[in-house]
Amino acid sequence: MVSWIICKAVVLVFGMLYPAYFSYKAVRTKNVKEYVRWMMYWIVFALYTVTEAIADLTLSWFPLYYELKIAFVVWLLSPYTRGASLLYRKFLHPLLSSKEKEIDDYIVQAKEKGYETMVHFGKQGLNLAANAAVTAAVKGQGAITERLRSFSMHDLTAVQGDETSENRPFATFPDGQKKARASVSDSSGFGSLRKDSGDDNTDEDVEVNSEDEVYTQKGLRRSQSMRSVKVIKGRKEIRYASLKHKPKKRPQLYFREDTAHHL
């Protein structure tokens, strides 16, 4: 682990930062000799980076592997050995010169195929995204319909009943109390009818001796009958066949001459 950390630090500092600074100076001073030297170094270092990535996966178990990497970077960079210039002139330049045309063709084909591949995979990605969105929408709609079907009509009526009971301004009576009240009102109306009929019978039996008493009794009888009619109209009318009453004809009143003379 310590060897890996030291190796990584040496490669970053001496293999990248130091050459980058001197490459800047070569470009600024327009020194062609130094410019060519550092260009050859960067070509060799790029090849070294690719080889290092493969070797770290396959040869990292080898003894003194990281120490050998440090020594190789120093050998490439040292002005005394000039390892980068040596590798480039002896191996890389002849190889690249012989394979230059093939490499250019591969690059052009890679660009064309890369564009077509990108468009193809882009279309597939859009189709997959659209299908996923439609599937999610259909599943969501199906879940909502199943949820609505799970409710029975009894549950819906119960919910409506709860809402109407909450919105009522006053409490309602149950059906039993309504029937009891209706029976009480009917019985009271029936009692008033019997009372009125009894009053009529007693009025018929009484003999009237004066015209003033006749008018006063008629007014009382009319007021009682009107009150009974109002009570019956305000409540539920119930007809009873056995309670039909036929009023008797009142006897005609004859006034004597003596009483008229006194009046």
From Swiss-Prot:
Residues 199-214 have a biased composition (Acidic residues). Residues 242-251 have a biased composition (Basic residues). It is found in: Endoplasmic reticulum membrane. Keywords: Cell cycle, Cell division, Endoplasmic reticulum, Membrane, Microtubule, Mitosis, Transmembrane, Transmembrane helix. The chain crosses the membrane at residues 2-22, 35-55. GO terms for biological process: cell division; endoplasmic reticulum tubular network organization; mitotic nuclear membrane reassembly; nuclear envelope organization. The keyword Transmembrane applies. Pfam families: TB2_DP1_HVA22. Residues 161-228, 240-263 are annotated as: Disordered. It is a multi-pass membrane protein. InterPro entries: TB2_DP1_HVA22 (IPR004345). GO terms for cellular component: cytoplasmic microtubule; endoplasmic reticulum membrane; endoplasmic reticulum tubular network. GO terms for molecular function: microtubule binding. Microtubule-binding protein required to ensure proper cell division and nuclear envelope reassembly by sequestering the endoplasmic reticulum away from chromosomes during mitosis. Probably acts by clearing the endoplasmic reticulum membrane from metaphase chromosomes. Belongs to the DP1 family. This is Receptor expression-enhancing protein 3-A. It comes from Xenopus laevis (African clawed frog). The lineage of its organism: Eukaryota, Metazoa, Chordata, Craniata, Vertebrata.
